[in-house]
Regions:
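Conserved catalytic or regulatory cores that recognize and/or transform ribose-phosphate-containing ligands
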Residues: 1-161
Length: 161
């Protein structure tokens, strides 16, 4: 797939493993929303990482694999999952948004935060790259390091007595 084919290439950065116990739901949420995008958008090739998720891969494995694609220079639309995307996806599945998903977006994910850094870096050398979704400043508001397999859990007050 190249930009020369006449199709736009979109990468969809979404929550996969950042909500403990919700990986299967996260994959359904992403797949449902991307399917609706594919039905609505003409001549757009959408890369959905949820379609390629392999249980057992850790965050480093996943980031290494996707960074190769992300730095290829072939992406011209980089969409980060918004709260509205998540709400629309649950609606398409005929479900209400559960409390654990309420208010979430790509900024909740350490993987998506790293991907935003990559997207901004790529945009410097490819100024035509469109970045869609929550603004970059929202990704970088947290300085906490993720703890666990690939979840965004943090140890709070660990050094306080």
């Amino acid at each position: 797939m190249t930009k020369d084919s006449g199709k736009a290439v979109m990468f969809y950065s979404c929550i996969i493993g950042s909500i403990p116990g919700q990986t299967a739901t996260a994959i359904k949420v992403a797949d449902t929303f991307v399917r609706s995008l594919r039905e609505r958008l003409d001549q757009v090739f959408i890369i959905n990482p949820a379609e390629y998720f392999e249980p057992g891969m850790d965050g480093d494995d996943l980031m290494f694999m996707w960074e190769q694609v992300q730095r290829s220079g072939l992406i011209n639309i980089w969409r980060f999952q918004s709260m509205e995307d998540i709400e629309a996806s649950f609606g398409l599945m005929g479900l209400k948004v559960p409390p654990v998903w309420s208010g979430k977006d790509a900024t909740f994910s350490t993987g998506c935060t790293k991907e935003m850094r990559i997207a901004l870096d790529m945009q410097r050398s490819h100024p035509e790259l469109q970045i869609v979704g929550p603004g970059p400043e929202k990704f970088f508001r947290r300085g906490d390091y993720g703890v666990g397999k690939f979840f965004d859990a943090t140890i709070s007050n660990a050094n306080q007595e």
